[in-house]
Amino acid sequence: MVLITQLGAALAVFSALTVAAPTKGKARFSAPQVGIPKKAKHHPAAAYARALHKFGMKIPKAVSDAAKGSVPTTPTQNDEQYVTQVTVGGSTLNLDLDTGSADLWVFSTETPQDESQGHNIYKPSSGAKRLDGYSWEIKYGDSSSAHGDVFLDTVTVGGVTTSSQAVESAKEVSSQFVKDKATDGLMGLSFSVLNTVQPQPQKTFFDNVLSQLEQPLFTCTLKHGEPGTYDFGYIDDSKHTGEIAYTQVDNSNGWWGFTADGYSIGGGSNSSYSLYGAQHKRANGGSISGIADTGTTLMLLSDDVVGDYYQNVQGATQDQMQGGWVFPCDANLPDFILNIGGYNAVVPGKFMNFQEIDNSMCFGGLQSSGGGSTPNIFGDVFLKSQFVVWDTQGPRIGFAPQA
């Protein structure tokens, strides 16, 4: 993704761009994920490089070099990718829902056949309108990219439809996307100011259906090792326990940004824990500001926090050849706890084992954001541990333990 620098100008044009379906104000719908066999054998550093590039961070050479490699996968680990089925025009596509971007881009009839083979493709409906002179382009840190044209077409998720959604049709995609047969594109759920369409950014699907919804929010219940669910327009109280802890969102740059009060490290991958238990051995002062992003696989935090965590993992080392922190796959991994307004959001230690590199070493789900002024990223490693509410009123974001 590219960073948008003229935010004010972009915001000024949104009201005239797209029109949602007739207002009902009572809609609520659920969009469950589905599991797709994962055939691509990317090195885990590729996910790390993508995250760094997406948020404008410098990509260390070691990470860039490692991202170009591959590793074997096993049927029992990293064997599925979780996507959401979305009807675009007349086509049902498997899309990644991404709260860190604002583009809806897809493989299409415009994509060369040798690139689209094995993917479901978008076929513009009879009522689709091409936006002449409009284009889009995305680039990621692992050298993957895509670009193309823009149509206005009907998009439906969970039975709720907008008839004038900007659909970014891929005319060319890089080999990294071609090889990833599990996904047919991406649907952004950040604030619309981040949309990359030129000459005028377009609204997200969520913004286009907002007036139809019972409540101006969506929730996600992402799971570790199984499909999760996105719910739009309502909060399903059966999916969480206890009260939801809310904190203010900083959306000045278009992202779902928030500030945690601090963190602690304790417990372990084989231990039980309570939210306020004595096993949470270390409490560290100083707030942590970051971005909640379902489109980033890893959790990226400052060097001092990352180093603090891995000094509690026996055998952990920062491996230049692998592009990040690695550790013995049988290591005991402590829990990571983020304190948000008095609520302790616990990431179980087992979530920190992102991917096996070889028969003995594994790549960590927590990596460095690079420090300095670069943002911290609370990606799927963190979000899969929580029930999360993304509320445009405020705006604010809420967290609770999953039921």
UniProtKB/Swiss-Prot annotation:
<dbReference type="InterPro" id="IPR034163">
    <property type="entry name" value="Aspergillopepsin-like_cat_dom"/>
</dbReference>
<keyword id="KW-0865">Zymogen</keyword>
<keyword id="KW-0064">Aspartyl protease</keyword>
<keyword id="KW-0964">Secreted</keyword>
<feature type="domain" description="Peptidase A1">
    <location>
        <begin position="82"/>
        <end position="400"/>
    </location>
</feature>
<dbReference type="InterPro" id="IPR001969">
    <property type="entry name" value="Aspartic_peptidase_AS"/>
</dbReference>
<keyword id="KW-0732">Signal</keyword>
<dbReference type="GO" id="GO:0006508">
    <property type="term" value="P:proteolysis"/>
</dbReference>
<feature type="glycosylation site" description="N-linked (GlcNAc...) asparagine">
    <location>
        <position position="270"/>
    </location>
</feature>
<dbReference type="GO" id="GO:0005576">
    <property type="term" value="C:extracellular region"/>
</dbReference>
<dbReference type="GO" id="GO:0004190">
    <property type="term" value="F:aspartic-type endopeptidase activity"/>
</dbReference>
<comment type="similarity">
    <text>Belongs to the peptidase A1 family.</text>
</comment>
<keyword id="KW-1015">Disulfide bond</keyword>
<dbReference type="InterPro" id="IPR021109">
    <property type="entry name" value="Peptidase_aspartic_dom_sf"/>
</dbReference>
<keyword id="KW-0325">Glycoprotein</keyword>
<feature type="active site">
    <location>
        <position position="293"/>
    </location>
</feature>
<dbReference type="InterPro" id="IPR033121">
    <property type="entry name" value="PEPTIDASE_A1"/>
</dbReference>
<comment type="subunit">
    <text>Monomer.</text>
</comment>
<dbReference type="InterPro" id="IPR001461">
    <property type="entry name" value="Aspartic_peptidase_A1"/>
</dbReference>
<feature type="signal peptide">
    <location>
        <begin position="1"/>
        <end position="20"/>
    </location>
</feature>
<keyword id="KW-0378">Hydrolase</keyword>
<comment type="function">
    <text>Secreted aspartic endopeptidase that allows assimilation of proteinaceous substrates. The scissile peptide bond is attacked by a nucleophilic water molecule activated by two aspartic residues in the active site. Shows a broad primary substrate specificity. Favors hydrophobic residues at the P1 and P1' positions.</text>
</comment>
<feature type="active site">
    <location>
        <position position="98"/>
    </location>
</feature>
<feature type="propeptide" description="Activation peptide">
    <location>
        <begin position="21"/>
        <end position="67"/>
    </location>
</feature>
<keyword id="KW-0645">Protease</keyword>
<dbReference type="Pfam" id="PF00026">
    <property type="entry name" value="Asp"/>
</dbReference>
<feature type="disulfide bond">
    <location>
        <begin position="329"/>
        <end position="362"/>
    </location>
</feature>
<protein>
    <recommendedName>
        <fullName>Aspartic protease pepA</fullName>
        <ecNumber>3.4.23.-</ecNumber>
    </recommendedName>
</protein>
